[in-house]
C-alpha cells in the first residue's frame, strides 16, 4: 500500500464573504494573529507527514506563493537587527514542505479544483485539506484519516457533528454501521434541504482519497450551485468501492465566514501568553 505523502489545498475561491478585504488580498492570507490562515492548514499537513503540497490557486493569489517563498532580503535585515525570533518564524514558513502551485482557470467548484491537480498526484492516494477550517488536535485531523486509510486501504472522509439547524450548509453522511469513530456510509448528500438531512454528521474539509476519484470527477455532472461537487463524485465512488467516514478528534474553528473568523481570532489571542491578561481586562471593561 502506498503511503500518503501528497496533499491538495484548494485556494482558488473568490472569498466573497470577506469583501471588500479580499478584493486584492487572497482570503487565505487573512491572518489569525500573526499567521495567515493557510499557514495553519499547511502546518497540519506537514505534522501529518505530508511532504509535497499542491495549492490550487486562481487569479490574484500571488501573495500565497510569496508567503511560502524565501525572502533573503527580509531575513538579512532581521539577522542584522538581532531579531532572531522573527527570523526563525519567517524561515519556518518556507521550510514546512515542498509546495507547488496549479491554477484553476474557471470557478467550477471543489471537484473541479481537485481535478486541476491530477497531474501532480498521479496514481497515488492523497489528502485534501480545505482552508475554511482550522483544527486543533493532539494528532493532526488529517493524520487521523491517514491512519484509517492505512488500516483499510479505502478512501476516508473526515466528519464531525453539527447542530441539526446547520446541516443544510454541509455535505452530510447517511451512516450505515459504526465502529468506534469510524463509519461505513450508505450515502453522501451535498447540502441537503433544511429538515431532510439523514444525520448531523457533516463533512469537515479533511479527506484522504484514492486516485480513482479522478475518474469519477472527470465524468461528474454539475450539482449544487451548478458546480462540480466533490461530494457527488465521492457518492458515486462509494457505490462501487466502500468509502469510510471518520469522526476525527479536535477543536474545529470555522474561519470561512466573518463571525467564525472573529471568534477564532479572539480565542487564539486568549491562548497567547503575551495577550491574554490585557485582552481579558479589555473584554471585561466592555461590560457586555
Curated annotation (Swiss-Prot):
Biological process, per Gene Ontology: enterobacterial common antigen biosynthetic process; UDP-alpha-D-glucose metabolic process
InterPro entries per UniProt: GalU_uridylyltTrfase_bac/arc, NTP_transferase_dom, Nucleotide-diphossugar_trans
SUPFAM superfamilies in UniProt: Nucleotide-diphospho-sugar transferases (SSF53448)
CDD domains in alphabetical order: UGPase_prokaryotic (cd02541)
Entry keyword set: Carbohydrate metabolism, Nucleotidyltransferase, Transferase
Recorded catalytic activity of this chain's protein: alpha-D-glucose 1-phosphate + UTP + H(+) = UDP-alpha-D-glucose + diphosphate
Entry's EC annotation: 2.7.7.9
GO molecular function terms noted in the UniProt entry: UTP:glucose-1-phosphate uridylyltransferase activity
Pathway: Glycolipid metabolism; diglucosyl-diacylglycerol biosynthesis
Similarity section: Belongs to the UDPGP type 2 family.
Function: Catalyzes the formation of UDP-glucose from glucose-1-phosphate and UTP. This is an intermediate step in the biosynthesis of diglucosyl-diacylglycerol (Glc2-DAG), i.e. the predominant glycolipid found in the S.aureus membrane, which is also used as a membrane anchor for lipoteichoic acid (LTA).
Protein name per its UniProtKB record: UTP--glucose-1-phosphate uridylyltransferase
Organism of provenance: Staphylococcus aureus (strain NCTC 8325 / PS 47)
